[in-house]
């Protein structure tokens, strides 16, 4: 019902198993159902760790971005930047990597740290590529 009322539909879902780096079946199923129902982007939260990313029918599903505010025994976290334009073309999605420790979060600025972070995300994701600048794309578009 919402799809005709907006230019770009983002669905935010609280889901998943805490501290599990891979999404469980109900997450992938629900994320894909959201895309099938008209969502342009699905972003999940709750696991307190980064989870993989996939493109389903050309639309991104970001299963979890980790803990940005709260400290965690697993410090990796990220921001997701979504850049839209007025022409209605596909948005550019970028990951901004960070680490959370002792109650604060810092963004990674060292190129080696960023590259290691992107390689990790690719390893837990599903057929995606991440450029040196953090831009996400389906592997078949690289």
Predicted regions, residues:
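Acidic, metal/ion-coordinating pockets
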Residues: 1-142
